[in-house]
């Protein structure tokens, strides 16, 4: 249930209004007409490009961890019928997923050069995917000596190869095809300011473009962002980020807190829905408290933390009644019914602040479908 607040700049006003000598009123009306509503990415394609490489690597690592958790959770449930739906991955695998996904992306972008789309989609790309994943898995096992909890799969058999082939088809035909439609604005703020008319005409243009102000403008007068990813995609992002948070936390807690030489962290399939829904609501709180009320970071964070604890307790209580709760803090001090503990308060504070940063970034990302 992550949350981060960084003062960031919203989109800059468009410079579509041209100056007419001696026609201040005409300039005002022309500027207002040119900036009626926030532009979508489809309406302003020149201002947006592909996601930066660092952002794609971040997404790829998070997406890879999600697949690890889904596969290991399904395997474990098939063996034990455990309703906790525990899944496993590790920071090492996150790094490998980032690198292998990035390499596969470069191969995917060469698809137009292949004379046969069928050959590329069902043979060439899946073969590269299976080969890279197998090589990465073998390298991880050799470096760590194998991992507990199913983080590192055994040697590939026929069923494993079939699963990897299906994942390769999903990766090429579903994930990358849509992920590469995401767009991010290029930084033109400084260039735009340098080319705006000076004095009163520039002020008029800034006022006319004020409807597009987003994070970073005057507090209390800003509009809540209306751009960004659709709500469903935001929910999916927050759910996957919840997996990332828990895998990293449990991994480092096992290694540092207990002195255990663990090579994996764990989470639960239910955490996807718990984190996704909680972060989705916290983001709405951020937009309301920051843009409508003008509240600063440390005035908002206590509200976030109270909501997070209430959300964790409610989910834990419901899952415990079904025998599906994957955590128990009864052995920790400052716990309540073993479902929440103040020991994790520093972590929730950090994640609460971090989510505002994530929200500011997601507000700039646009999904632009291609024909």
From Swiss-Prot:
The keyword Magnesium belongs to this UniProt entry's keyword annotation: no
Keywords: Membrane, Transmembrane, Transmembrane helix
Principal place of residence: membrane
Protein's UniProt keywords contain Methyltransferase: no
Subcellular location: Membrane
Location of the region described as Disordered in the Swiss-Prot/TrEMBL record: 1-30
Regions that span the bilayer: 51-71, 117-137, 235-255, 269-289, 301-321, 334-354
GO annotation, cellular component aspect: membrane
Disulfide-linked positions: none
Domain of life of the native organism: Eukaryota
Its membrane topology: Multi-pass membrane protein
Family of the protein in this entry: Belongs to the TMEM229 family.
Name under which the protein is recorded: Transmembrane protein 229A
């Amino acid at each position: 249930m992550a949350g981060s607040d960084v003062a960031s700049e919203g989109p800059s006003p468009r410079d579509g209004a041209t100056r007419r000598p001696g026609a201040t009123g005409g300039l005002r009306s022309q500027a207002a007409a040119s900036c009626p509503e926030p532009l979508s990415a489809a309406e302003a394609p020149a201002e947006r490009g592909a996601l930066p490489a660092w952002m794609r690597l971040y997404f790829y690592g998070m997406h890879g961890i999600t697949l690890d958790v889904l596969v290991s959770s399904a395997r474990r449930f098939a063996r034990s019928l455990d309703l906790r739906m525990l899944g496993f991955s590790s920071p090492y695998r996150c790094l490998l997923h980032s690198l292998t996904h990035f390499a596969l992306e470069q191969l995917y972008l060469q698809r137009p050069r292949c004379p046969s789309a069928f050959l590329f989609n069902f043979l060439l790309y899946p073969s590269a995917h299976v080969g890279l994943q197998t090589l990465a898995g073998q390298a991880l096992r050799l470096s760590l000596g194998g991992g507990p909890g199913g983080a590192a799969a055994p040697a590939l058999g026929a069923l494993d190869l079939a699963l990897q082939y299906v994942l390769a088809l999903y990766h090429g035909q579903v994930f990358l095809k849509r992920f590469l439609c995401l767009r991010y604005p290029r930084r033109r703020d400084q260039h735009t300011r340098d080319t705006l008319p000076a004095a009163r005409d520039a002020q008029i243009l800034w006022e006319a473009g004020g409807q597009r102000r987003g994070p970073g403008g005057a507090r209390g007068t800003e509009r809540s962002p209306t751009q960004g990813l659709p709500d469903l995609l935001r929910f999916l992002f927050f759910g996957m980020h919840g997996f990332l948070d828990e895998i990293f936390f449990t991994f480092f807690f096992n290694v540092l807190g207990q002195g255990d030489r663990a090579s994996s962290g764990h989470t639960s399939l239910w955490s996807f829905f718990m984190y996704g829904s909680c972060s989705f609501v916290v983001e709405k709180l951020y937009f309301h408290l920051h843009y409508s009320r003008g509240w600063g970071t440390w005035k908002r964070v206590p509200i976030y933390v109270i909501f997070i604890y209430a959300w964790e307790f409610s989910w834990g209580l419901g899952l415990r009644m079904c025998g599906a709760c994957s955590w128990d803090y009864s052995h920790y001090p400052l716990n309540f019914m073993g479902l929440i503990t103040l020991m994790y308060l520093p972590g929730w504070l950090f994640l609460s602040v971090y989510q505002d940063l994530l929200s500011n970034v997601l507000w700039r990302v646009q999904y632009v479908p291609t024909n």
